[in-house]
Amino acid sequence: MIEVFNEKEFISKTLQVRGFADTVIIEDSKVYVYDIKTINAWAYKMRFGRSVKKKGSIHQELQVATYGVLAEQEYGSIDGIFLIYYNKDNSHIKVLEVDRDKMLTAIAFWNSIKVEHKHGLPALKKGVSPAMDWECKYCSYKTQCDKDKLKGE
């Protein structure tokens, strides 16, 4: 029997994190987690073309690894975590398996976040939080950051 879940919500009380995996497939008690990344042809070529100029994003790997950790907590095991890159310009698809060791890195990351938050809202770290400048437009704290930037903070 195969079960497929799209936008599967996971909540971890131990890590104090909530996330939505794009797809979770359970087949014969094996659990697979997928996160889908949509990119344009140029970004796809830079990542997968003959002369690869850009390595995969550690942030994307840690995102899907976090979903893997959460799935393992819910289902008791995890058999694979994957990033699916979809080229929106020509519909080409590339599936990459993420090393399950990244799950340990994700656990360490979320535990460090819990420690930081014990002392109040942590400061922003360029390249970490936010990982990319464009992420700011999706953040609940954007207006506060904009005010802080104007003050020189």
What are these regions (language model features)?
Residues 52-71:
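Short, charged, amphipathic alpha-helix that recurs within catalytic cores of restriction-modification
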